[in-house]
């Protein structure tokens, strides 16, 4: 085109303003799936830590597609999900202004890693959190039972307080992540009893999600610091002879009103924003104690999901994990909230059964050639370090 364009759509969406850093690193669940009393009692969300990415090979099962029954290669994300510990229950009452919490009941004993969540400086603190509350159990459980009965009588929504076991991961952080998870299925009394029975007990990922399920991933994206207008909004570079910079917006508004409108693309913070990624498919839920959690029917080699040398900047996955199709928000080590989907899925892609043929476990530090240490030893033979 040899002439100027006088009209074009704006660059960048205004629906995500303000583009500022997220207030907290853990993804917030702003809506839970609709409750169904006919189903058994179950949790609707789970927390995990992003370990890294790899790739898999599988046969596409999509009749009518040109790739039907042919091998395809896909990128996958591995999220480590140690069992979560239930430490409390919260009851919510429906009001004209929405849900309002009625009362909260905590467990008798709380671990140190979750108590750290209530202190800014654990080292200098007196560490007396929940000491008075624990006396209610020692003296009499009448007050505890009274609060639980209030939840059964007045509340319509029940959520449990559960925290991660961050000490079981390679992360250096000692402070566990705590969140409210809605309990769906059964009556309100069933939910309260389920929560009471699971006080100070663990809940694993397999009791919440299952193979081939479509879920949502909520987290905070990778932070990029301050970026210019072109990188932040995707505006067009100006011509070469433009005065005072090319990666800018040439006109930032009219003379009047005598201020810059909020819709004008400007430089500022990029990344580290709260995002909800919909419709991620679970390809595998692996057990941490399974020595063949990366093996398949096609590839019977005994190997774990951790690549040779460990996941880059993460380490070794020793707990339960979930493998999701594609990428997820945030860098490695970022805590991610996995939530059951709010939608009823009917598409062929969502209902397609997934059967993995091969999972790559080669080193991610370079061009890895070997899938297991035994394979590398067989190819390289005896090395000097083995003799010494």
UniProtKB/Swiss-Prot annotation:
Residues 1-10 have a biased composition (Basic and acidic residues). One of its GO terms (molecular function) is RNA binding. This is Large ribosomal subunit protein uL3A. There are 2 genes for uL3 in S.pombe. Component of the ribosome, a large ribonucleoprotein complex responsible for the synthesis of proteins in the cell. The small ribosomal subunit (SSU) binds messenger RNAs (mRNAs) and translates the encoded message by selecting cognate aminoacyl-transfer RNA (tRNA) molecules. The large subunit (LSU) contains the ribosomal catalytic site termed the peptidyl transferase center (PTC), which catalyzes the formation of peptide bonds, thereby polymerizing the amino acids delivered by tRNAs into a polypeptide chain. It is found in: Cytoplasm. Component of the large ribosomal subunit (LSU). Mature yeast ribosomes consist of a small (40S) and a large (60S) subunit. The 40S small subunit contains 1 molecule of ribosomal RNA (18S rRNA) and at least 33 different proteins. The large 60S subunit contains 3 rRNA molecules (25S, 5.8S and 5S rRNA) and at least 46 different proteins. uL3 forms together with ES39L one of the contact sites for the signal recognition particle that targets ribosomes to the endoplasmic reticulum membrane. Belongs to the universal ribosomal protein uL3 family. It holds the Pfam family Ribosomal_L3. Coiled coil: none annotated. The modification Phosphothreonine is found at residue 372. Its main location: cytoplasm. The modification Phosphoserine is found at residues 13, 65, 140, 143, 207, 295, 355. SUPFAM superfamilies: Translation proteins. The keyword Disulfide bond does not apply. Residues 1-34 are annotated as: Disordered. GO terms for biological process: cytoplasmic translation; translation. The gene is rpl301. Residues 18-31 have a biased composition (Basic residues).
């Amino acid at each position: 085109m040899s002439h100027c364009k006088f009209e074009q759509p704006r660059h960048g969406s205004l629906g995500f303003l303000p583009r500022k850093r997220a207030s907290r690193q853990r993804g917030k669940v702003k809506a839970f799936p609709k409750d169904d009393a006919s189903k058994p009692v179950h949790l609707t969300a789970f927390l995990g830590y992003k370990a890294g990415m790899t790739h898999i090979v599988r046969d596409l099962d999509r009749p009518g597609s040109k790739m039907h029954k042919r091998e395809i290669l896909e990128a996958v994300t591995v999220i480590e999900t140690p069992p979560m510990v239930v430490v409390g229950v919260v009851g919510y009452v429906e009001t004209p202004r929405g849900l309002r919490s009625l009362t909260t009941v905590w467990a008798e004993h709380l671990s140190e890693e979750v108590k750290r969540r209530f202190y800014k400086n654990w080292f200098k603190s007196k560490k007396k959190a929940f000491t008075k509350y624990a006396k209610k159990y020692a003296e009499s459980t009448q007050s505890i039972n009274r609060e639980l009965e209030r939840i059964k009588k007045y509340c319509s929504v029940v959520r449990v307080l559960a925290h991660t076991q961050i000490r079981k991961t390679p992360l250096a952080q000692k402070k566990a992540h705590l969140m409210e998870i809605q309990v769906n299925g059964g009556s309100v009394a069933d939910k309260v009893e389920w929560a009471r029975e699971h006080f100070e007990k663990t809940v694993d990922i397999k009791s919440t999600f299952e193979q081939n399920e479509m879920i949502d991933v909520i987290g905070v994206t990778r932070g990029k610091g301050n970026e210019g207008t072109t990188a932040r909004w995707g505006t067009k570079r100006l011509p070469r002879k433009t005065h005072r910079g090319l990666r800018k917006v040439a006109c930032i508004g009219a003379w009047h009103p005598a201020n810059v409108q909020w819709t004008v693309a400007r430089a500022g913070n990029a990344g580290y924003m709260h995002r909800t990624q919909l419709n991620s498919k679970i390809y595998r839920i692996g057990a941490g104690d399974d020595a063949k959690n990366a093996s398949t029917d096609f590839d019977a080699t005994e190997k774990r999901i951790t690549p040779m040398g460990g996941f880059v900047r993460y380490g070794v996955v020793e707990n339960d994990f979930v493998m999701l199709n594609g990428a997820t928000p945030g860098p490695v080590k970022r805590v991610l909230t996995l939530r059951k989907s709010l939608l009823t899925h009917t598409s062929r892609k969502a209902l397609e059964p997934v059967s993995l043929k091969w999972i790559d476990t080669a080193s991610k530090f370079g061009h890895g050639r070997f899938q297991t240490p035994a394979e590398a030893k067989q190819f390289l033979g005896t090395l000097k370090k083995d003799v010494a």
